[in-house]
Amino acid sequence: MSKSGNGNGDKVLYCSFCGKSQHEVKKLIAGPSVFVCDECVELCNDIIREETHETHEETEARLPTPKEISNFLDEYVIGQQHAKKVLSVAVYNHYKRLQHKSEDGVELGKSNILLIGPTGSGKTLLAQTLARILNVPFAMADATTLTEAGYVGEDVENIIQKLLQKCDYDVDKAQQGIVYIDEIDKISRKSDNPSITRDVSGEGVQQALLKLIEGTVASVPPQGGRKHPQQEFLQVDTSNILFICGGAFAGLDKVIRERSDKSSIGFSAQLKSKKSSNDEVSKVLGQLESDDLIKYGLIPEFVGRLPVVTTLQELDEAALIDILTRPKNALTKQFQSLFKMEGSELEFRGEALIAIAKKALERKMGARGLRSILENILLDTMYDLPSLEGVNKVVIDESVVNGLSKPILIYEQDEKKSASGSKD
């Protein structure tokens, strides 16, 4: 017992760990026959934090193999097997390069990635999922909002600021993060010839991104403050940040065809229909060369900074149905969880899923259009359900998806009647 008396007869309490008296510390916490002071509590917290951090670092040290990365992507992203393989290898090599600095003097270059695919094919989701499996900070940027320094819009350094925000301004963590720049095709040069006038949202942005993607020390104001001369900047080295750029590149297949048609002019040339199917477009994109991207409007230096290029196919009806049901966080599972919170089961019939997929194909939004379709279908039900009592199940069939009828509500009493009827 850490107690003792003083001359006045009052008992002085002492910390059972460090021996300091109650007068030497701010707070003394009493337990059964022991006392602990606030200083010892703080010290214990520090020890626990350090051990947790060390354990976390040990866990992070193991880099998953390309197969493991691809298998993890399969849990969240449907299809796009070739793109997954390319990404898995590129990301594995990138982080292996960071973990094992070359001892034989061979300097390993950084392999940034370019994803080409239609809207809603899974470009953003692939990049997000990669960051999740590797447990690294992830930031997204829209290339259309970027401008050259000094013009109205976002500076390219703002991308690094977003990355810092994701890891509480831990510079070391940010320097090993992943940055995804979407709509990269929208900053293509407006013509083949270098622009005489300023192109602040096209070629100018490509020039500004060059150094950032290749590797430079970016100066970022701390905690999102505005830039001013007296302020100390955070210095972030972008050499080890993996940049993934994505875009739809509409019309790129025509650029590739023009190039290939030049080599097959004459009697041996095959006549091609004006309209191309999705499979034909995918085959054409498979013949992509760096010169095609330059012809499209990316400057040669920018194309050179993105050595790993892979294409994603447009999702068909079967793939969209799989996206609705198969992934861990599939949309139907998300809405079923919402309805479960209200005590109701949500059921999607097979023909309803087909109708939803067909609607998404009509809108040409790919997987991105699925959520808005489901939101519209379930809006009235989600509005009414919290006010209704005894709704056991909500059923969605094809007619509901096509707007011909309302969702079927099955009440608790109806289920009891049908159950008793079957017994009789």
Curated annotation (Swiss-Prot):
Keyword line: ATP-binding, Chaperone, Metal-binding, Nucleotide-binding, Zinc
Record has DNA repair as a keyword: no
Pfam family, one: AAA_2
Record carries keyword Methyltransferase: no
One Gene Ontology MF term: ATP-dependent protein folding chaperone
Sites where the protein binds ATP: P118, T119, G120, S121, G122, K123, T124, L125
InterPro entries, per the entry: AAA+_ATPase, ATP-dep_Clp_protease_ClpX, ATPase_AAA_core, Clp_ATPase_C, Clp_protease_ATP-bd_su_ClpX, ClpX_bact, P-loop_NTPase, Znf_CppX_C4
Gene Ontology, cellular component aspect: HslUV protease complex
GO BP terms in the entry: cell division; proteolysis involved in protein catabolic process
UniProt-annotated binding residues for Zn(2+): C15, C18, C37, C40
SMART domains linked to this entry: AAA, ClpB_D2-small, zf-C4_ClpX
Limits of the ClpX-type ZB domain: 1-56
Function: ATP-dependent specificity component of the Clp protease. It directs the protease to specific substrates. Can perform chaperone functions in the absence of ClpP.
Subunit structure: Component of the ClpX-ClpP complex. Forms a hexameric ring that, in the presence of ATP, binds to fourteen ClpP subunits assembled into a disk-like structure with a central cavity, resembling the structure of eukaryotic proteasomes.
Similarity-based family: Belongs to the ClpX chaperone family.
Name this protein carries in UniProt: ATP-dependent Clp protease ATP-binding subunit ClpX
Organism: Legionella pneumophila subsp. pneumophila (strain Philadelphia 1 / ATCC 33152 / DSM 7513)
